């Protein structure tokens, strides 16, 4: 026995048989050990060979395992070191068979032939030899890795035409133009290799699946009838190719098989760019170069699919590129997407066991097109339908909220009952009786509701079964019509099909008024998924939200005092957006806030973010003092290629990509470099911006606020002279025109001039600032009370028409917070104290009324 003349796989099988014998503590390696190794996997070569020869590999495997269990166990160093004479004879016979078959190496299939001769109850040698020839495709074993080239197409490819015949592919709606163009190229004499090029998610693979379905139906020209489309899996080809030349050998076997089929097989490679450089190593040939000769001669027909960006990989190799004919696949329109979804609807209904309404389909196409901008139709719309249906299915399979709430209440009462059982006083006993009565009532109610829910679920289960049967019957009709079994087709179409359709309709009708089972995916479900993905509120306005929007001014006034014009302008823009009346191609609103420092420009932006999103974190704040130099502008959209930081993207674009629905504040806009305004023009007009990576970022769901101190001296001067608000506004506008270009000012929705704060407004701000301080003190369980005189004192000290409300914060810090902090540290004010503040001759006076001890 010469192991040098065995293939790698055969040597490995023998080594594994030895390991098995050692692990099971058997004296020697015998036939059952080798059989157990060879039949370990259903996809193994031995298993496939025995199946082809008409044997039952599963029964053989079980028989050999029983035989292994019967072998005696031994101890010592000699375990599993020898071959039995039976196995030794079989291995020598394998070498003789190798000569007979004109092979250079003993392969795994040759071993199977030799072992089968030595094992009773298996097919004869001639039957096995016939199966072996079929499996090898008429080739002999000339290399050490020959097994990986057997039946290469079956091993490394997926037959799409077979899947289409079995009804396992989704229907392909539309795309007739592209399919016709692919057929046209495939029918050419040479260079008959179409490559589908398009953005991810537009349906390139679906076009090939559509072609496979047409071939199965016979709806193709004569030259393509009866052909097979096999999808080549590059991953499978590369996986496990450990040795130099093994990958090339596998690919060569695939190419050979396709060439030998004489045009019967059309190869399909998804992600075609992977063939460039696949298997490339030092001195090795990559897949692209191996495919070139067969492609050029027209011996091999290949359909490729790749994205626009990745097609560049193929363009780098002009000799490979010229062998392909590009077919550009555009993104379908919203209307075409709706047709595609209507065609797919049934598949998803059967899979999830729910109904998908037509309004949900229209919503999926329109909302995904409008709000999910980084992905393509129809993929993103299909994903929405799929996820909404999965969500409804999950809700159907878990206990309804009504029952869940009652069960939780019952559990709470049971815990209470157990605690009361230990008490002996009359009150507790009385309470115990009441609880037991309530538990009994709840148990009865839960049982009644559960029975109703179970009844509805049973109807739902029957409905799903009927839908699956209906799907199978439709597939059978299609198959019968293809095979011209018209009697069977008529029997199913006019007998079985109407019966099942009526059953599905009747069961659906029963569930229509169901209490717990909601069977239909609606427009609202789709809107909720979009909101979940993007953070943009697109679902219907709930009553609470309507109230909030109608009272938006009140909400904003809780934190921003005065400035009615600014608050009204912002609130109106938000209401227009949520009512669906805003221009879909522009931001929700763009405002320029002007006015002296400290009057609430930045505070209004923060308040808006907190009101809309319940957190100030939803505000993207860009401080324009950081963008005073020309080179700093690139930080907004990202550094250009080749510069440090290119990979990180822009500070503005990345923030908006992560949170498309937000308030963007450009603070102190007049301090920015003029080039920043060129970037803003695009955002304000088109609601979009392209970053340094070429990605389009959507600003259509943002509120853009720019603040500036320009014209502040004019505003103060005007107020001192008693000018009306309109005149002040006009004067400030003149200053703006000197500083900003007309095309920038013209794109803003509104330019709002903030008024300086009056004494009365400062007094209101004192209350707001004190509420923040009280909230901080509440954490220490200290309450704070100020007399009206103390509040007036703070307002008087903090009033400055030039600096706005900011001096007030400093006064509160100095006059109130600092003395209070000293008293807390000195122990004069402790947890649980009530601090009263009044005005004395020297400033504020603090008093702590005597604590009442509990």
Swiss-Prot record:
Sequence segments annotated as region (NBD1): 151-331
| Ranges where the record places region Repeat 1 | 6-71
UniProt feature coiled coil, ranges: 382-516
Gene name tied to this protein: clpB
Q: Which GO terms describe its molecular function?
A: ATP binding; ATP hydrolysis activity; identical protein binding
Listed binding positions for ATP 2 are 595-602
Q: Which InterPro entries match?
A: AAA+_ATPase (IPR003593), ATPase_AAA_core (IPR003959), Chaperonin_ClpB (IPR017730), Clp_ATPase_C (IPR019489), Clp_N_dom_sf (IPR036628), Clp_R_dom (IPR004176), ClpA/B (IPR001270), ClpA/B_CS1 (IPR018368)
Reading the lineage from the top rank, the first entry is: Bacteria
Name a biological process GO annotation.
cellular response to heat
Q: What is known of its domains?
A: The Clp repeat (R) domain probably functions as a substrate-discriminating domain, recruiting aggregated proteins to the ClpB hexamer and/or stabilizing bound proteins. The NBD2 domain is responsible for oligomerization, whereas the NBD1 domain stabilizes the hexamer probably in an ATP-dependent manner. The movement of the coiled-coil domain is essential for ClpB ability to rescue proteins from an aggregated state, probably by pulling apart large aggregated proteins, which are bound between the coiled-coils motifs of adjacent ClpB subunits in the functional hexamer.
| This protein's UniProt keywords | ATP-binding, Chaperone, Coiled coil, Cytoplasm, Nucleotide-binding, Repeat, Stress response
Task: Tell me the SMART domains matching this sequence.
Answer: AAA, ClpB_D2-small
Q: Report what the protein is called.
A: Chaperone protein ClpB
**What residue spans carry the region label C-terminal?**
757-854
Region entry NBD2, spans: 545-756
PANTHER family registered for this protein in UniProt: ATP-DEPENDENT CLP PROTEASE, HEAT SHOCK PROTEIN 104
> Where is the protein found, in the record's own terms?
Cytoplasm
Q: Which CDD domains match?
A: AAA, RecA-like_ClpB_Hsp104-like
Q: What is the effect of changing residue 167 to C?
A: Great decrease in chaperone activity. Retains ATPase activity and oligomerization
Task: Tell me the subunit arrangement.
Answer: Homohexamer. The oligomerization is ATP-dependent.
């Amino acid at each position: 026995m010469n192991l040098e003349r065995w293939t790698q796989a055969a040597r490995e099988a023998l080594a594994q048989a030895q390991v098995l014998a050692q692990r099971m503590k058997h004296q020697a390696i015998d036939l059952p050990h080798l059989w157990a190794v060879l039949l370990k996997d259903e996809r193994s070569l031995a298993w496939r060979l025995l199946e082809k020869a008409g044997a039952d590999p599963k029964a053989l495997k079980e028989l050999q395992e029983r035989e292994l269990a019967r072998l005696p166990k031994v101890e010592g160093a000699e375990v599993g070191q020898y071959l039995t004479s039976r196995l030794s004879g079989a291995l020598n016979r394998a070498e003789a068979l190798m000569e007979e078959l004109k092979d250079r190496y003993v392969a795994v299939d040759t071993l199977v032939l030799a072992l089968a001769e030595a094992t009773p109850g298996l097919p004869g040698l001639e039957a096995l030899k016939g199966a072996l020839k079929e499996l090898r495709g008429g080739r002999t074993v000339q290399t050490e890795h020959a097994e990986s080239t057997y039946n290469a197409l079956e091993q490394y490819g997926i037959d799409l035409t077979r899947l289409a015949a079995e009804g396992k592919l989704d229907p392909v709606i539309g795309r007739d133009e592209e399919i016709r163009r692919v057929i046209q190229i495939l029918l050419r004499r040479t260079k008959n290799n179409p490559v589908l090029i398009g953005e991810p998610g537009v349906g390139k693979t679906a076009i090939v699946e559509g072609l496979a379905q047409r071939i199965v139906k016979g709806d193709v020209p004569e030259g393509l009838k009866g052909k097979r489309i096999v999808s080549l899996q590059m991953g499978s080809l590369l996986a496990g190719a450990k040795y130099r030349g093994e990958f090339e050998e596998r690919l060569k076997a695939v190419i050979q098989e396709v060439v030998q089929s004489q045009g019967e097989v059309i190869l399909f490679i998804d992600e075609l760019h992977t063939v460039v450089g696949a298997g490339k190593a030092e001195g090795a040939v990559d897949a692209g170069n191996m495919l070139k000769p067969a492609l050029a001669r027209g011996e091999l027909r290949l359909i490729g699919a790749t994205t626009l960006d990745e097609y560049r990989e193929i363009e780098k190799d002009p000799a490979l590129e010229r062998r392909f004919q590009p077919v550009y696949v555009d993104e379908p329109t919203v209307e075409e997407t709706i047709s595609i979804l209507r065609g797919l609807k049934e598949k998803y209904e059967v899979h999830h066991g729910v109904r998908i309404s037509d309004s949900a389909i229209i919503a999926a196409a329109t909302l995904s097109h409008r709000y999910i901008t980084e992905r393509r139709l129809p993929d993103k719309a299909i994903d929405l339908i799929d996820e909404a249906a999965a969500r409804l299915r999950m809700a159907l399979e878990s206990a309804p909220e009504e029952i869940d709430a009652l069960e939780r209440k019952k559990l709470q009462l049971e815990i209470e009952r157990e605690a009361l059982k230990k008490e002996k006083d009359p009150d507790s006993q009385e309470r115990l009786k009441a609880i037991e009565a309530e538990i009994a009532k709840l148990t009865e109610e839960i049982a009644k509701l559960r029975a109703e829910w179970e009844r509805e679920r049973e109807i739902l289960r029957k409905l799903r079964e009927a839908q699956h049967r209906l799907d199978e019957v439709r597939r059978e009709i299609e198959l019968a019509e293809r095979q011209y079994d018209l009697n069977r087709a008529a029997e199913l179409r006019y007998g079985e099909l109407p019966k099942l359709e009526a059953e599905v309709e009747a069961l659906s009708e029963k569930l229509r008024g169901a209490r717990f089972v909601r069977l239909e995916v609606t427009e609202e479900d789709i809107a909720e998924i979009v909101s979940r993905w993007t953070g943009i509120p697109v679902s219907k306005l709930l009553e609470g939200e309507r109230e909030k929007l109608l009272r938006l001014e009140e909400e904003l006034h809780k934190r921003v005092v005065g400035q009615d014009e600014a608050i009204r302008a912002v609130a109106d823009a938000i209401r227009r957006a949520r009512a669906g009346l805003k221009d879909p191609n522009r931001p929700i609103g763009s405002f320029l806030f002007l006015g002296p420092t400290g009057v609430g420009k930045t505070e209004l932006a923060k308040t808006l973010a907190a009101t809309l999103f319940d957190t100030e974190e939803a505000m993207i704040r860009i401080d324009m003092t950081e963008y005073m130099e020309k080179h700093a502008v690139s930080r907004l959209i990202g550094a250009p290629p080749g510069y440090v930081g290119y990979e990180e993207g822009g500070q503005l674009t990345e923030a908006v990509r992560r949170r498309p629905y937000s308030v963007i504040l450009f603070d102190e806009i007049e301090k920015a470099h003029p080039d920043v305004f060129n970037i803003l023009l695009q955002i304000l007009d088109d609601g979009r911006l392209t970053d340094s990576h070429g990605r389009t970022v959507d600003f259509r769901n943002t509120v853009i606020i720019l603040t500036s101190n320009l014209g502040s001296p004019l505003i103060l001067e005007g107020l001192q002279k008693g000018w009306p608000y309109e005149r002040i506004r006009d004067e400030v506008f003149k200053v703006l025109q000197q500083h900003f270009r007309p095309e920038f000012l013209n794109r803003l929705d509104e330019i709002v001039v903030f008024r300086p704060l009056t004494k009365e407004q400062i007094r209101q701000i004192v209350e707001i600032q004190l509420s923040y301080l009280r909230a901080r003190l509440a954490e220490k369980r200290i309450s704070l009370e100020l007399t009206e005189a103390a509040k007036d004192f703070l307002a008087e000290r903090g009033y400055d028409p030039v600096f706005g409300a900011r001096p007030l914060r400093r006064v509160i810090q100095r006059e109130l917070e600092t003395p209070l902090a000293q008293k807390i540290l000195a122990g004069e004010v402790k947890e649980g104290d009530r601090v009263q503040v009044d005005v004395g001759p020297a400033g504020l006076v603090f008093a702590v009324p005597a604590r009442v001890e509990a």
